Design a protein with these regions (language model features):
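Acidic, divalent-metal-binding catalytic cores of TOPRIM
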Residues: 1-186
């Protein structure tokens, strides 16, 4: 490994790897995570980030590192506060902390894709519990939703579902985050 991204769980690994590979294939990203040997490392809940910082674990590996977490916006306010605290700790350590603009990674899934695959129309917002809503609608465990559908998201859909407006400018959150991550080792 040439660098690491600290993430909460296995779905985050699927999310980042697939998005980077798809965006690279379409030319929206210069490289995939594998190309630049950046490895997502599962650390469990957001509370573990604090220990990685205070115990210098990532630093002791001698590799560039950053953190990628769900923002949980629209969820438990205490959790949102906890994530903001972790962000401050990571940034004070001189590292980059990425929190999703949407509540969780499942909120980036394309409802049309889910309907194409399952025949079930599902509606969700950027800040609702999409994982639960989709899971209930299609009859699967919420924790399996991302791993089932995300690998079938095209680059076009990934860009479309992560587009936001910054003033008059249209930007793609996932292209920006992944560009920063893949350039971390350069």
């Amino acid at each position: 490994a040439q660098g690491i991204v600290l993430v909460e769980g296995k779905s985050d690994v699927t999310f980042l790897r697939h998005a980077a590979s798809s965006l690279k294939q379409s030319g929206a990203l210069p490289a995939s995570l594998e190309d630049v040997k950046i490895v997502p490392v599962l650390i469990g809940g957001c509370g573990s980030v604090k220990h990685w910082v205070t115990l210098n674990l990532a630093k002791d590996l001698g590799l560039p590192w950053c953190v990628f977490l769900d923002s949980d916006i629209g969820g438990d306010p205490a959790q949102v506060l906890s994530i903001q605290k972790r962000k401050k700790e990571v940034e004070e350590a001189g590292k980059v902390f990425f929190a999703t603009r949407k509540r969780e990674i499942e909120n980036y899934l394309c409802p049309d894709l889910i309907e194409e695959i399952t025949g079930v129309a599902v509606t969700f917002t950027d800040t609702c519990d999409a994982k639960k809503i989709i899971g209930r609608a299609v009859g699967m465990k919420p924790d399996n939703v991302l791993d089932k559908f995300w690998p079938q998201m095209t680059s076009e859909r990934i860009i479309s579902r992560s587009t936001y407006h910054d003033g008059t400018q249209e930007r793609s959150e996932l292209v920006e985050i992944l560009s920063d991550i893949v350039s971390m080792t350069r």
